[in-house]
Every structure is written in C-alpha cells, then in structure tokens.
Design a protein with these regions (language model features):
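Aromatic-rich, lipid-facing transmembrane alpha helices and their immediate juxtamembrane interface loops
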Residues: 1-159
Length: 159
C-alpha cells in the first residue's frame, strides 16, 4: 500500500498518467518535449480524473473500493476525484522540476509517437461496457461521451 492505495493501483496510475500525457499533447497540438507547460499538466490531470469518474463506479460495484463516508456518485466521494486530479498535477510538476531540459525527443512516426494517446482514448469506451452491464448508466454515458470528445479533439487538433 501507498497510504491507503494498493501498490498495483499506484503502478497502474503511472501508466494512465503517461497515456493521458500523450493524449494531452495530441489534443492540444503541442509538440511532445522533455518538459511541458502547466496547461498540459492541468489538461492531463483533468483527463485522468475524468477517466476515474468512469472507472471508480465499477470498482465500487465490484467491492474493490469502500469509503467510510460514501459519496453520492455511485458511492464515490468527491474528494476522491479531487485527490486524483491534484496527485496527477503534483506528480507531473515534480517531473518537470527534475527532468533534464535539453534531452531531444526522438522523432518517430505519428502513430508510434501517439500510440499511448490512442489507447487512452479507447479506455473510457472500454470501461463504459461494464458500466452499462452493471446499470451504472451515468458512468457509462460519461465513458462513451469522453471517448467521442477525445476523438473529435484529436482530429481537430491535427487539421
């Protein structure tokens, strides 16, 4: 455990943050660099938090999460989402402080460069299916809508 969070969740979130960061660069139209602006940090933190809005109701329904004071959104308290937003922002801000600023980012094909972003775009849609199966309709609608938003945003940013 890291605090009250199982270590595997912390490790999986590092991957989600990485994919969300790639997606943030894709939809903002900002080139991927070794360091990034605070607007990218905020966007990435927001994207990860919205994904959590889709994922956490499933975890609660499966009995993997439980809070002493459950929230109104499928038992998930608001401070959970606020916490993930700020944890992501802090992690990325700390990375920016310690990152080597003169490391060139290798150029590679568009699809290789943004492969993590493409996976992130699909995750809310993938998570929406079990939401609908478990009658977590709001979470499912958010998942489908979020994927559609990310698809449209990524297409319009590359025009």
């Amino acid at each position: 455990f890291v605090g009250n969070v199982p270590i595997l969740i912390a490790l999986s979130w590092s991957g989600l943050i990485y994919m969300s960061l790639s997606c943030s660069f894709l939809i903002s139209g900002i080139d991927i660099t070794g360091i990034f602006s605070y607007s990218v940090i905020i966007l990435c933190s927001l994207l990860v938090t919205i994904l959590d809005v889709v994922l956490d109701p499933i975890a609660v329904d499966e009995g993997r999460w439980k809070w002493d004071l459950p929230g109104k959104y499928y038992g998930v308290p608001l401070q959970n989402f606020i916490g993930w937003f700020f944890n992501t922002a802090i992690i990325l801000s700390l990375y920016n402080l310690i990152a080597v600023h003169d490391v060139p980012v290798e150029s590679s094909s568009y699809y290789v460069k943004y492969a993590p972003a493409f996976l992130f775009i699909l995750l809310p849609l993938i998570a929406a299916r079990p939401c609908f199966e478990r009658n977590l309709k709001s979470a499912g609608v958010i998942g489908v809508s979020f994927t559609l938003f990310l698809i449209v945003s990524s297409i319009t940013s590359s025009l």
